[in-house]
C-alpha cells in the first residue's frame, strides 16, 4: 500500500461502510445510501496541541457529513480531513 501522510492538522480516515437494508430486507445499492459519517483513523498529521487532541491511528470517529477530500488508494476510499471536522471519538 502506498503510504499517505497528512500534512498539518489533518487526518487520513477510512469510511466504515455499513450494509443498509430496508425493513423488508432489501439491500440498498451504494447510490441510494446516505454518506457514512463513521470512519477509522489511518494516519495523523502534525497536531500542534497533542495533549488536547486524543485521537490516534486505529480510533473510530464521527466526522462532518461533507468535510474533507475523498481520495482512492489501491482501489480503497479514504478521506483527508481537517481535525476540526472530527465531531466525536467512538469508544466501544
UniProtKB/Swiss-Prot annotation:
InterPro entries from the UniProt entry: Chaperonin_GroES (IPR020818), Chaperonin_GroES_sf (IPR037124), Chaprnonin_Cpn10_CS (IPR018369), GroES-like_sf (IPR011032)
Pfam families: Cpn10
GO biological process, one term: chaperone cofactor-dependent protein refolding
Recorded coiled-coil stretches: none
Keyword Phosphoprotein: no
Compartments, record wording: Cytoplasm
PROSITE patterns per UniProt: CHAPERONINS_CPN10
SMART domains linked: Cpn10 (SM00883)
Keywords recorded for this protein, A-Z: Chaperone, Cytoplasm
One GO CC term on file: cytoplasm
GO molecular function, one term: ATP binding
Keyword Protease attributed: no
Subunit structure: Heptamer of 7 subunits arranged in a ring. Interacts with the chaperonin GroEL.
HAMAP family: CH10
Function statement: Together with the chaperonin GroEL, plays an essential role in assisting protein folding. The GroEL-GroES system forms a nano-cage that allows encapsulation of the non-native substrate proteins and provides a physical environment optimized to promote and accelerate protein folding. GroES binds to the apical surface of the GroEL ring, thereby capping the opening of the GroEL channel.
Family: Belongs to the GroES chaperonin family.
Name the UniProt record assigns to this protein: Co-chaperonin GroES
Species of origin: Thermotoga maritima (strain ATCC 43589 / DSM 3109 / JCM 10099 / NBRC 100826 / MSB8)
Amino acid at each position: 500500500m502506498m503510504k499517505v501522510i497528512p500534512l498539518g492538522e489533518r487526518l487520513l480516515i477510512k469510511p466504515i461502510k455499513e450494509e443498509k437494508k430496508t425493513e423488508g430486507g432489501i439491500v440498498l445499492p451504494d447510490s441510494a445510501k446516505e454518506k457514512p459519517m463513521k470512519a477509522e483513523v489511518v494516519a495523523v498529521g502534525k497536531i500542534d496541541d497533542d495533549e488536547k487532541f486524543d485521537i490516534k491511528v486505529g480510533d473510530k470517529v464521527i466526522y462532518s457529513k461533507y468535510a474533507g477530500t475523498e481520495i482512492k488508494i489501491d482501489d480503497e476510499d479514504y478521506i483527508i480531513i481537517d481535525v476540526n471536522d472530527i465531531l466525536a471519538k467512538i469508544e466501544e
